[in-house]
Amino acid sequence: MATKIRLQRHGRKGYAFYKIVVADSRAPRDGKFIERIGSYNPNTNPATIDLNFERALYWIGVGAQPTDTARNILSREGVLMMKHLLGGVKKGAFDQAAAESKFEAWLKGKKDALNNMKAKVKEAAVADDKVKLEAEKAVNKARAEAVAEKKAAEAKAKAEAEAAAAAEEATETEETPMEAAAEEAPAAESAE
């Protein structure tokens, strides 16, 4: 039977995640499968892959053909590297212990690279948050200054209005004694 290792789509529209399955090559994409060997979620950064390494190695060993994306996933997880090393053991190029040590060294390098990538993503997110915070502080400061200027202008206008009202009131009080004195003066003249 011609078998393929491929992805079976699940999830909602716009947020797909996949099961990694071994299926007959003639079966539909989301149809019947022989065995589920893992899952793949490309929505996270970096993509989340959960793979049963031994079963994937078995199916590759018996001739299952991976699709392009499944091949990339198997390569990233080291299944294809292990198949390559086991081929060298079969040919007698080196023994099983040497193959294991080479695989461990390769896997350590891959994990270090993945951890570095995760750290860079995290640092970029922190830096982006810091820039956004600084921009928000600048906007808030500008708004506060605008509000302070508006309040100062209102206070100045109110003070000017109060001063004008006080000056007008003072002129009214000054005019009243003069008028009263003027009225008293003609009355005093007429009395004489």
From Swiss-Prot:
Example of a GO cellular component annotation carried by this entry: small ribosomal subunit
Highest rank taxon of the organism: Bacteria
Ranges annotated as biased composition (Basic and acidic residues): 149-161
Annotated InterPro entries: Ribosomal_bS16, Ribosomal_bS16_dom_sf
Gene3D superfamilies: 3.30.1320.10
GO biological process terms, semicolon-separated: translation
Region annotation (Disordered) ranges: 149-192
Keywords: Ribonucleoprotein, Ribosomal protein
Annotated Low complexity bias: 178-192
One GO molecular-function entry: structural constituent of ribosome
Family: Belongs to the bacterial ribosomal protein bS16 family.
Protein's recorded name: Small ribosomal subunit protein bS16
Lineage of the organism: Bacteria, Pseudomonadati, Bacteroidota, Bacteroidia, Bacteroidales
Name of encoding gene: rpsP
